[in-house]
Amino acid sequence: MTVLTDSDILIEVSRGRDKALVSQWLELAQSDALILYSAVSAAELWAGARPPEYTALDALFEALLCVPIDATLGRCAGEYLRRYRKSHAVELGDALIAASAVERGARLWTRNRKHYPMPELAFYD
């Protein structure tokens, strides 16, 4: 199984406050699952990070595989924006994250499902 983690999950894992979520994270990490993150999520986490959090963020990102943004993801995200920007207020970052999951055949782990109305997108619980 391949799982792409959304920014909200990565934030909670890096801060460690939600014990149930951290437990679920550890269970996933110890399985044979491939855990991915989007370059968009990296940008969002680094933008909000404080210096005492830098080492933990470096360790978190080093343990996972980054999905880089390329032309294929750009096209897919652009299609999502065209389809869902007005009806669901989908923003560029969420469109790129959804495209990353769909193009990699990954399930998206997020607590913000309303940001992702794409029917072809599978979720991880």
Predicted regions and their residues:
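Active-site neighborhoods of divalent-metal-dependent phosphate/nucleic-acid chemistry enzymes
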Residues: 65-111
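Short, well-structured N-terminal submotif of metal-dependent ribonuclease cores
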Residues: 1-37, 46-62
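Histidine- and aromatic-rich ligand-binding microenvironments
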Residues: 6, 37-38, 90-91, 112-113, ...
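Generic structural signal for small/hydrophobic residues in well-ordered secondary structure
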Residues: 6-7, 45, 77, 101
